[in-house]
Amino acid sequence: MWQIVFFTLSCDLVLAAAYNNFRKSMDSIGKKQYQVQHGSCSYTFLLPEMDNCRSSSSPYVSNAVQRDAPLEYDDSVQRLQVLENIMENNTQWLMKLENYIQDNMKKEMVEIQQNAVQNQTAVMIEIGTNLLNQTAEQTRKLTDVEAQVLNQTTRLELQLLEHSLSTNKLEKQILDQTSEINKLQDKNSFLEKKVLAMEDKHIIQLQSIKEEKDQLQVLVSKQNSIIEELEKKIVTATVNNSVLQKQQHDLMETVNNLLTMMSTSNSAKDPTVAKEEQISFRDCAEVFKSGHTTNGIYTLTFPNSTEEIKAYCDMEAGGGGWTIIQRREDGSVDFQRTWKEYKVGFGNPSGEYWLGNEFVSQLTNQQRYVLKIHLKDWEGNEAYSLYEHFYLSSEELNYRIHLKGLTGTAGKISSISQPGNDFSTKDGDNDKCICKCSQMLTGGWWFDACGPSNLNGMYYPQRQNTNKFNGIKWYYWKGSGYSLKATTMMIRPADF
């Protein structure tokens, strides 16, 4: 189509150029043939000669000045007529030329149009095919893109839904946390008020304690001065006591000598008395059975030996016949003793004393004995533990204790660890602890790994007897930090 339009414009330009050349040729008088060349087209025009026109060399011209006015006018009219004829002839020739060109151009235009249409159709078909291919490719790409966009959109929608659910969950959690924070803030405010009140109370108490401390310091100062005076008096009393003890010792020797003399004289007079004195007792049960039913100190004899020992016999408790092997009541005797002292015994049988491990070991290995432990606290309460079978091993086995059959009110569990433990002292460590329990807890005892009991510990007076790990303790009655007021360990034959 564009080629046809271009050809039409080209031919119009050719005709216009031919017309312009024709006008130029008309201006040149004397030329009878005119030729127009435009591209591959060549046009030749033959025009008639102008016979009626005069040349400028006419004799009338040289005399034109001398002619009258009517002659000049007629000449002009004639010339105009000639020109009109010429113009009419030219017009006719141009019309013929135009008709000729139109007739010739129609055929050429038809051929050109047919060729152009064929060429253009092929081009258009090719272009259309390319466009269809491109359109199909673009459509396929658009379909892929659309699918990708759809998948991406779906994924984004799912993510958006997840984010929305997560956001809702977070909002709920935030609301819950906000509620918890508000509760905590309220509780914190309450606690702050309580702390402030406690601080005020604490300040008041500190002031009161400070005042009491000042008062106590004054009292301590006074007591220190009193103690110094008492120490001076004690030193004086000690000196006097030493003198009195010496005097008492001399008196005792004198009394013993007198008693010996009296016994000798009585023996000479009454032979039955000498026979009674030769009778010996193994334990207080034999003393009780012999008719002596009064509490007191009696002389006992080691089994299979003539060696004697002083012991206190309880002839009233539980039917009597009890041999006291340990007693604590006032802290007058120090129980932080050596192995040898615990072996042979120490103290005063009428007060605090330890009978001796060697005698108890030999005695309890002769026959079956029971052990009763009687306890008192500082509040006036009493309790006991009774073991149906008791004996001590020999010194070679560190006087190991053996107990069976516990009854009593001082705890359902034995405060003396079982099986039997070896005896330990400050110079004979036989316990199961690397800490040396006898040195740490004081006193000699059957320690395990320091164990739940120690009746030979440090004696503490009332109001100082709590929270004492090294006191006189029996764990399963009063706990580990309570130091008892009094204890008694006594034995008696099981068949008494």
From Swiss-Prot:
The keyword tRNA processing does not apply. It is found in: Secreted. Residues 166-248 form a coiled coil. InterPro entries: FIB_ANG-like, Fibrinogen-like_C, Fibrinogen_a/b/g_C_1, Fibrinogen_a/b/g_C_dom, Fibrinogen_CS. Ca(2+) binds at D429, D431, C433, C435. Glycans are attached at N89, N119, N133, N151, N240, N304. Residues 275-495 form the Fibrinogen C-terminal domain. Keywords: Angiogenesis, Calcium, Coiled coil, Developmental protein, Differentiation, Disease variant, Disulfide bond, Glycoprotein, Metal-binding, Secreted, Signal. Residues 1-18 form the signal peptide. GO terms for biological process: angiogenesis; animal organ regeneration; blood coagulation; cellular response to growth factor stimulus; gene expression; germ cell development; glomerulus vasculature development; maternal process involved in female pregnancy. Changing R492Q: In LMPHM10; uncertain significance; no effect on protein abundance; severely decreased secretion. It comes from the Eukaryota. Disulfide bonds join C284-C313, C433-C435, C437-C450. GO terms for cellular component: cell projection; collagen-containing extracellular matrix; extracellular region; extracellular space. The keyword Cell division does not apply. Its main location: secreted. PANTHER family: FIBRINOGEN ALPHA CHAIN (PTHR47221:SF6). It is linked to Lymphatic malformation 10: A form of primary lymphedema, a disease characterized by swelling of body parts due to developmental anomalies and functional defects of the lymphatic system. Patients with lymphedema may suffer from recurrent local infections. LMPHM10 is an autosomal dominant form characterized by the onset of swelling in the lower extremities within the first year of life. Lymphedema may also occur in the neck, upper extremities, and scrotum or labia majora. Gradual resorption generally occurs, although some patients may experience progression complicated by cellulitis. Binds to TEK/TIE2, competing for the ANGPT1 binding site, and modulating ANGPT1 signaling. Can induce tyrosine phosphorylation of TEK/TIE2 in the absence of ANGPT1. In the absence of angiogenic inducers, such as VEGF, ANGPT2-mediated loosening of cell-matrix contacts may induce endothelial cell apoptosis with consequent vascular regression. In concert with VEGF, it may facilitate endothelial cell migration and proliferation, thus serving as a permissive angiogenic signal. Involved in the regulation of lymphangiogenesis. This is Angiopoietin-2. It comes from Homo sapiens. The lineage of its organism: Eukaryota, Metazoa, Chordata, Craniata, Vertebrata.
